[in-house]
Amino acid sequence: MSFQVRRDRSDDRSHRFNHQQTWIPRNSSTSSVVVNEPLLPPNTDRNSETLDAGSASRPVYLQRQHNASGPPSYNHHQRSSNIGPPPPNQHRRYNAPDNQHQRSDNIGPPQPNQHRRYNAPDNQHQRSDNSGPPQPYRHRRNNAPENQHQRSDNIGPPPPNRQRRNNASGTLPDNRQRVASRTRPVNQGKRVAKEENVVLTDPNLPQLVQELQEKLVKSSIECMICYDKVGRSANIWSCSSCYSIFHINCIKRWARAPTSVDLLAEKNQGDNWRCPGCQSVQLTSSKEISYRCFCGKRRDPPSDPYLTPHSCGEPCGKPLEKEFAPAETTEEDLCPHVCVLQCHPGPCPPCKAFAPPRSCPCGKKMVTTRCSERRSDLVCGQRCDKLLSCGRHQCERTCHVGPCDPCQVLVNATCFCKKKVETVICGDMNVKGELKAEDGVYSCSFNCGKPLGCGNHFCSEVCHPGPCGDCDLLPSRVKTCYCGNTRLEEQIRQSCLDPIPSCSNVCRKLLPCRLHTCNEMCHAGDCPPCLVQVNQKCRCGSTSRAVECYITTSSEAEKFVCAKPCGRKKNCGRHRCSERCCPLLNGKKNDLSGDWDPHVCQIPCQKKLRCGQHSCESLCHSGHCPPCLEMIFTDLTCACGRTSIPPPLSCGTPVPSCQLPCPIPQPCGHSDTHGCHFGDCPPCSTPVEKKCVGGHVVLRNIPCGLKDIRCTKICGKTRRCGMHACARTCHPEPCDSFNESEAGMRVTCRQKCGAPRTDCRHTCAALCHPSAPCPDLRCEFSVTITCSCGRITATVPCDAGGRSANGSNVYCAAYDEASVLQKLPAPLQPVESSGNRIPLGQRKLSCDDECAKLERKRVLQDAFDITPPNLEALHFSENSAMTEIISDLYRRDPKWVLAVEERCKFLVLGKARGSTSALKVHIFCPMQKDKRDTVRLIAERWKLGVSNAGWEPKRFTVVHVTAKSKPPTRIIGARGGAISIGGPHPPFYDSLVDMDPGLVVSFLDLPREANISALVLRFGGECELVWLNDKNALAVFHDHARAATAMRRLEHGSVYHGAVVVQSGGQSPSLNNVWGKLPGSSAWDVDKGNPWRRAVIQESDDSWGAEDSPIGGSSTDAQASALRSAKSNSPIVTSVNRWSVLEPKKASTSTLEPIAQIEESSSSKTTGKQPVEGSGEEVVDDWEKVCE
């Protein structure tokens, strides 16, 4: 929406030059504004070239017209191309219909009949391009004064009838008052223009200029350095090459950076820096960078909301011909005009002015073109007719640029010696200009043969132009003998036919070798060859020989070549030179003759090009092969053929990427879930229910195309022996590999037999023997025997069984019984001789004196009712000093010692919590040295890693689990010193024992490229950094706030989880175990948020397995130990009575009993999940959990 600044006009003509209404474009999305600007003097020079230079680059302005009888209309006016304000006669009236006025390109004073009236009908006035006098217009009045003038582009003084007098009262005319009263406010106009979505663009402006102006108005341009938006009021710098816009502070920092310097330009031109956008070299220093408008005329331009941001509003004035024009361009070829647009970003438009008339290349016609087209080929289309270089014929081509072609006219010409006549091309002859009949024009390459001036001899030169010259044997030219050492007297020779006398001296002429002289007597003719013996080297310089000198210098002489091969690598770097006596053996390229280079590999490359179809046809070379130059002239389609690229295409062009679904139907019948592709279709990914290969469980959400699904359960199928179950994890059938000849036979499975022995409670240790009874051998299972009081113990073989085959009392022993008896700590108690042999495992040891003393002490304790402290549990090693330190502190502070022992127990036996790292660590609070030593001793019993950190008095101890960590033989404070299998009670945080978890930040499983130097630099004096190993570290702070800050700011930091649980307000201690998991809770409760991590059926396990046992279990330590021993040593069965598996009825019934028990127990744990009816499989949702 535009608003008008109206004022009264004075009758005085000089007053009209003080102010004038000019148009200033705001942006592409808003309307124009009429403001007052001072006018140029009347004599301002405006030439026609400047006028036309900006005619094609005018912005189009939109003005809203208000009519009383209808909605507002729009009126498009074109901007004047004059530089500066227009003359006073170029005032415009508003409320004119569309396309009413067209521009006039007449140059000169305006004609009287060229006044334009407003409120005229559409297309009334058209642009006049006539060179003669203009035709009179038909004036139409529409409630307008008689002397209302239209805009004219004529240059010159205004006519006198173009004056407007002000009203006497100083007010506007009635019609103008009505227009002004109907003018809308600015904000309302903007809102209406926005609602109507009016887009104002000028096709004559470069697209980059329009885009930059629009982005600057919307503040959507990003600085390439800081990636921040460039605002209207920000100081900027614009590159003159790529027109990128940067913040002034950002570009100054870039210019000061060492990486922005162009090293080549720095050597030649001094200080410089490169533009971040186009890398063009800027030959200014960072201190000289300043904020200027786009045309560079005004420094620190003010922010005007009606102008393009960062524009000064003045004419651009940049030369339309860049100073980096081609080198061959002369000053006359450069454009003399400047840009007349308002100060703008981006490139200036091409010049639209007319250049001075120029002649065509042939010079017959003068051509007038635009200034921007002055370097184009200006041909007139007529025949050239220029004289060719031969000087005899004219050019017959059409008017052309550049030199004329050589003359191709055929002429009959004779040679210089007049022996031969040929038809030659005129342009190939050396003789230029007119030809005379007696002159030859070319050489026939034969001897001339013309008689010389003496008349006695003939010319021996090759056919040549001009006279032949004088005879060389004339007395006037021969002054000496043949060798030149003796001068001849004039009276000796009278004519050229007289012989030349020779002297008696040695010739001494320099031979062709240029090293020796002729030793013959003065003679006629050429000197004989040089016979001096010289040393000649071969081409490679490794061998030499003695030969006559003329052999080394004669052009036809034999080349001396040795037999030594070169062996150096050729230019390809792959093959070696096999040339014998190679001149490049010693790296001397000067010895090469002609273009021959023996180290240029002549083997074809023949490598496969990147296209994969063609081979490299170049010679063997180093580096990458050039791209394939073959072309494809057929459509390049995808696999389904629905997406293609039309030819021509370069060989090796990848197939188009097709986003359509694959048309091949899935064999399973599900819908396609993958895109177009080459080759076989991927497996179907639709989730379905599937059984594992062993038939143990039904897995849900399994991809349909996934094959060979295995769970983690034991196979349990009966093997071919009929006695044992397969102990492998879930696998496809069969469990045993066998030959066809063994079909139907019971074959050993190579497992231990496991049948109960008849002589003892142990099982048969022999390999499976389905077709034979168990061998009657002595039992070799290790058992423990004791004395009567139980103090002395020893481990011996069971020794039961082992009768001979004939039933006699002769036993077969598989070991040396005497050596076992010698190692016993005490002798065996005697037995009665009843004739039956008592196995060694069923006998007892004899008590000694120490046993008697302990028995007496026990009797006294029972008599006096004395209960001594359980210090026996501390005697767990041979280190008496360590035992005394712990025992002493245990007597003084048993609660503290038990607390430390409990935390070590949780580190070794508990499960990690709160982190994906397998490392378990605990930090004790700062304490005195004697307690730190006790912590170290207790941790060493559990084989834990121990380290101390910090300074006194805040030095603390850190313990963590290692690969060697394991429970000790006895635990301090436990009854009998045994380790319970049940889950331990989680200890709670104690400020007298444990470090506050809020002060610790963990850095666990650090990647190799991780760098925590930021922690050292920022929090170096506020924390202690403790390295547990090369990938795990802890940071212990002194303040909670700084620890929380480090947790937020530092990478790879995580929450510290020790061996204690911080008790929250009102929460029962039994809700969490030591690692933060509910005892007895299933994976369904923990991972109920993720449907892929659910398991319907859970199996209880001890603390060493996948699940924690309930705290406070009723099973004793002995029962738990026996249970763990049974899990590791007992054979796997498939029925309740494994010895009756061969009976069909019993086997089928008993086999389903354990599975039924599993289903019954699982039904009480699941949340509404029911097993599949009529099958013995378990149904689970988490197939990943099962396959782990």
Swiss-Prot record:
Q: GO annotations under biological process?
A: defense response to bacterium; protein ubiquitination; regulation of hydrogen peroxide metabolic process; response to light intensity; response to microbial phytotoxin; response to salt stress; salicylic acid biosynthetic process
Metal-binding keyword on record: yes
Main localization of the protein described in the UniProt heading: nucleus
- In residue numbers, the region (Disordered) covers 1-52, 65-195, 1100-1188
Provide ranges: composition bias, Polar residues: 19-34, 168-186, 1126-1138, 1159-1169
Q: What happens when the gene is disrupted?
A: Impaired growth and survival under salt stress. Reduced H(2)O(2) production. Less susceptible to Pst DC3000.
UniProt keyword annotations, A-Z: DNA-binding, Metal-binding, Nucleus, Plant defense, Repeat, Transcription, Transcription regulation, Transferase, Ubl conjugation pathway, Zinc, Zinc-finger
Paired cysteines (S-S)? none
User: Which parts of the sequence belong to the R3H domain?
Assistant: 894-963
Q: What is known of its domains?
A: The RING-type zinc finger domain interacts with an ubiquitin-conjugating enzyme (E2) and facilitates ubiquitination.
Protein name, entry field: NF-X1-type zinc finger protein NFXL1
The species this protein was found in: Arabidopsis thaliana
